[in-house]
A protein has these predicted regions:
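Non-heme di-metal
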Residues: 1-338
């Protein structure tokens, strides 16, 4: 199908034409992603084994829950990439990026598999972690949230109606703002809490690179939303705004339940109330990025997660010379303020 027949990004079809390029920003994002290639073999987890032995029972419980979530979270993301996003975002430039993103999600899954093998030497513990969606209520609730908001578009073959396109937008926004942009941001906060105390350096190093990748994925998805808003502004009505706001509120509550599971009665420097404020701050940032008003007005309580309004992590990685890139050795040091 030629470009002249396809007027909008979500028009059904399979656009193949890269010249003239209709969406050069998506292509540039693909090229930027290539520069940030990393491999699991670059992550040294040896020192983490000794650190694990130093943790309190409460901290060990937190780590166990984190690796259980990591074991399943990126698989949900990868499935949605293949079954929904690649299918309906009709741009060869965007599909180049999505192909690259799928590779990155596979690297993340490999990293978490290596993490599980290192952190959980008992085969039964590993099996339980991979079955977390079935046997850990707080993780099951997060998975159910994802399926509730994302599955409605799965059986749609073509986005031919406004209602179908709004359902797709809800899927994309859930994927970007809630899973990549809230659930993973919450999980990474626990990792950096350990890192701020000089613990689990290997986990923190791998998380630096995963965090950067996830932020780039989120920003790409938001750019897709921006493009659809320009091409079809009528899709962004009051009802969609309310649905997105409700979605973010539900995501905060689901992630907060996970936080209660991880934190219990609280740990020094990490407790449920602080996590609530952090998640609300992140949710407000996501709503504002989508062009909707914030609802919480909370501030980030974690000095170790001072992200200048949460949304500027990508800029941080771009300006740090130690960020890993192809043919460049080094790690990201989060000890410095940013």
């Amino acid at each position: 199908m030629s470009s002249t027949e396809n007027k909008n990004l979500l028009d059904p079809g399979f656009e193949l034409t890269l010249r003239p390029m209709r969406y050069p920003d998506f292509y540039e994002r693909y090229r930027d992603a290539i520069k940030n290639t990393w491999t699991v073999e670059e992550v040294d987890l040896h020192s983490d084994v000794a650190d694990l032995a130093k943790l309190t029972p409460g901290e060990q419980h937190m780590i166990g829950r984190l690796v259980a979530f990591f074991a399943t979270g990126d698989s949900i993301v990868a499935n949605n990439l293949v079954l929904t996003l690649y299918k309906h975002i009709n741009s060869p430039e965007a599909r180049l990026y999505l192909s690259r993103q799928l590779f990155e999600e596979a690297v993340h899954v490999q990293f978490y598999l290596t993490l599980l093998d290192t952190y959980l030497p008992d085969p039964d513990d590993r099996a339980a972690a991979f079955a977390a969606v079935e046997n850990i209520p707080s993780i099951r609730e997060k998975a159910q949230f994802c399926f509730t908001w994302m599955d409605s578009v799965e059986k749609i073959e073509k986005l031919e109606t406004a209602a179908d396109r709004r359902r797709f937008l809800l899927n994309l926004i859930c994927f970007a703002a809630c899973i990549e942009g809230l659930f993973f941001y919450g999980a990474f906060a626990y990792v950096y809490w350990f890192r701020s105390r000089g613990l689990l350096h290997g986990l923190a190093t791998g998380t630096n690179w995963v965090f950067r990748d996830e932020t780039m994925h989120m920003n790409f998805a938001f750019e897709v939303v921006d493009t659809v808003r320009k091409e079809e502004p009528e899709l962004f009505d009051d009802a969609l705004q309310q649905q997105v706001t409700d979605m973010l509120k539900e995501a905060v509550e689901a992630e907060l339940q996970f936080g209660r599971d991880l934190c219990g009665d609280g740990l020094p420097g990490m407790n449920t109330e602080s996590m609530r404020e952090y998640l609300q701050c992140v949710a407000d940032q996501r709503l504002q990025r989508l062009g909707f008003p914030p609802v919480y007005g909370s501030e980030n309580p974690f000095a170790f997660m001072e992200l200048q309004g949460v949304q500027e992590l990508t800029n941080f990685f771009e300006r740090r010379p130690s960020a890993y890139q192809v043919a460049v050795e080094g790690t990201v040091d989060l000890d410095e303020d940013f």
